[in-house]
Amino acid sequence: MTLLLTFATCVLSALVPLVNAEAYLVAVSLTSSTAGLWALAFVGALGQTVGKLIWYEAARRSLSWGWVRRRLETPQRQEALARWRGRFAERPWLPMSVLFLSASVGLPPLLVIAVLAGQLHLSRVGFAFTVLVGRTLRFAAILGGLDWLTELLARLG
C-alpha cells in the first residue's frame, strides 16, 4: 500500500508543483520500514515520469490547438521553432543531457523542460527513460543521504 500511495502522490506532484515529492518520500522513509530505499526511489520516479509525460503530451499536442497555431503562424516564429528542432536533431545528446540534468538535479525545472521537450517533439521513449533514470537517482540520493544521516545521529546519540 505504501508503494501505491507513493506512486499516486508522485504523479500528483509531477502535475501540481505545490505537492513536493521529495518531502513525501522523506516522510515515508522515516515512518515506514516496509519500503526499501531503491523501491521507494524507483516507484516515486515512476510516478513522476507518468506525470511529466502528461505535461509532455499536452505540450506536444498543443501545437495543433487553434489559438497556439495562430500565434505560430508568423514566419518568424515558425522559423524559430524549425531552427530549434533542427539544432536538437543535429545534436540529440544536447536536449537529453539538459533533460537528465533537470530530472536529477532539478535545474532547470523539470516541468518547464517537459513542456519544451513536448513542443520540440523530442523522442517520447527517450524522454520517459531519461526522466525515470534521473528521478530514480535523485530520489535514491536524497533517501540514501537521509538514511546515512539517521544512522550517524543514532551512533552519536
Language-model features: locations:
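Transmembrane helix boundary and interhelical junction motifs in multipass membrane proteins
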Residues: T6, C10-V28, V105-L116
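Membrane-interfacial helix-loop-helix
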Residues: M1-L5, T31-P108, V112, Q119-G126, ...
